[in-house]
């Protein structure tokens, strides 16, 4: 069944019909979902979801946009929640320079990225990395940590070149691929998907964002992942069923140690 490794069902976009959508997942071929924390102090929604739905798991961490409001208490809370049975990763963490142009902001993000990578290492959990307009700095920090007995991880919503992808693949990491792969102008990502072994790819939505064609611009959900599987299958010259089976196995191997 489909394994969605990165979703945000605690987002307000689902406030009107959250239970209805999540209750339809099994019939839609979706077997597992990881709901990923993002905002500092916004962990409650993920906690509620992993308690309410047996097939929903959690990742706990803070998105780089909130690095400036993180405190030691935030880091302590991430560590505490990482001990929960259904918390399977630290994320989403990383660097985002798109809106944050100042060097001081970059240093702050890097400090909080490293602090959360330390938690991932010490708690023996995989990481989920968000990286936007920060290719070199993200790669440098990940390389540094991958020498320190990490438990692997996913480069979420991968958007860089095939050369950068090759560096992550050499480290044994996974690339998260979602709706962007179906976009006509996604030439760079299609090149990455062509060179990346299927054994190092996982499917993700980043819902409610990043809906694939033919639903681009609408609210996304895990039920759209067959479109992504089909696009990846066409690139690889295999069936969508094989894509779904292998990416599910990949996700379980990384996140469940299965």
Residue ranges and their predicted role:
Residues 1-258:
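Mid-domain alpha/beta scaffold segments of enzyme catalytic cores
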